[in-house]
Amino acid sequence: MENNMVMVHEIPFPPEIKTTKPLSLLGYGITDMEIHFLQVKFTAIGVYLDSDVVKHLQQWKGKKGNELAEDDDFFDALISAPVEKYLRIVVIKEIKGSQYGVQLESSVRDRLAAEDMYEEEEEAALEKIVEFLQSKYFKKDTLITFHFPATSPTAEIVVTLEGKEESKLKVENKNVVDMIKKWYLGGTSGVSPSTISSLADNLSAELSK
């Protein structure tokens, strides 16, 4: 199995994972930031999707990857497609859970506020996520996963510290769940341009089959 691993900046990702059905690794990349003129990599990201997703993206058949990467309507269709989605995020540079939580919270809150959807329910759901993350310390190789079922507007976040300690949180606010998807899969506004570019190239290839 090891030989089949896809290496994302020296972090191995399985080409397929099984949840309720097999999901394929269709996009991967990193989050990074320039600090004191050095490019620091924080996380490696793998995006796993049900291969049926291409049925919902047929109107983009024939488009090249670089065209799709710039097309936010394409990524909106990907996010709203009623298929299972799974994000596997591996920590490269250790970070406090509270720092990761603040990044997630501010991005999701800003996106909700921009669409006039930030109400008390959304605030409460975000607070629960921040509380869940803030007591943790994400060492290198900590695994964070987001599982988005095909038909339910929920998400399950799982954090595995040092390969053993699993904690789970279910997010049940649909608006917050949608904006978490947009944080990672939101086209030109996504947190990881390399992941968006990889998704666009691979989905372009899948659509041309």
From Swiss-Prot:
> Could you tell me in which tissues this protein is expressed?
Mostly expressed in glandular trichomes (lupulin glands), and, to a lower extent, in cones, cones bracts, leaves, stems and roots.
Q: What is its main location?
A: cytoplasm
GO terms under cellular component: cytoplasm
Q: What is this protein called?
A: Chalcone isomerase-like protein 2
Q: Where in the cell is it found?
A: Cytoplasm
Q: Which reaction does it catalyse?
A: a chalcone = a flavanone
Molecular function (GO) terms for this protein are:
chalcone isomerase activity
Residue intervals passing through the bilayer: none
In UniProt terms, what function does this protein have?
Answer: Involved in the biosynthesis of prenylated phenolics natural products which contribute to the bitter taste of beer and display broad biological activities. Involved in anthocyanin biosynthesis. Polyketide binding proteins (PBP) which promotes the catalytic activities of CHS_H1 and PT1L and triggers demethylxanthohumol (DMX) production.
